[in-house]
């Protein structure tokens, strides 16, 4: 697993996360086209997805369901939403893990 697709609409946070992951040997791609995330996912063909819930034009729950229809790639939700209901929903829709912001990079790694 070396290619990680980061779907985070906060460009600063996405860049910081990408740099941290690249520093330990991962290749990363930050989402660019929030109108066509599924198509971008298919083009990127990642080994892992890091997915926020609150996104422009969609939400991470819906995108997770769409990804699950075409791929079994691991999906880690990283979000500021810390309710147990959101965590349960994320995992029941196909997410593999759920981490709340602010998060610790060692925990993520």
Report residues per predicted region:
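N-terminal/domain-start alpha-helical segments
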Residues: 1-109
């Amino acid at each position: 697993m070396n290619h990680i697709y980061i779907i985070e609409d906060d460009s600063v946070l996405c860049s910081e996360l990408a740099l941290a992951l690249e520093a330990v040997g991962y290749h990363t791609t930050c989402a660019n086209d929030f109108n066509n995330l599924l198509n971008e996912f298919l083009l990127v063909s990642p080994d892992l997805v890091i997915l926020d819930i609150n996104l422009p034009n969609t939400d991470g729950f819906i995108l997770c369901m769409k990804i699950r229809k075409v791929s079994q790639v691991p999906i880690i939700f990283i979000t500021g939403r810390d309710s147990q209901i959101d965590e349960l929903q994320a995992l029941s829709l196909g997410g593999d893990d759920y981490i709340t912001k602010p998060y610790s990079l060692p925990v993520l790694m």
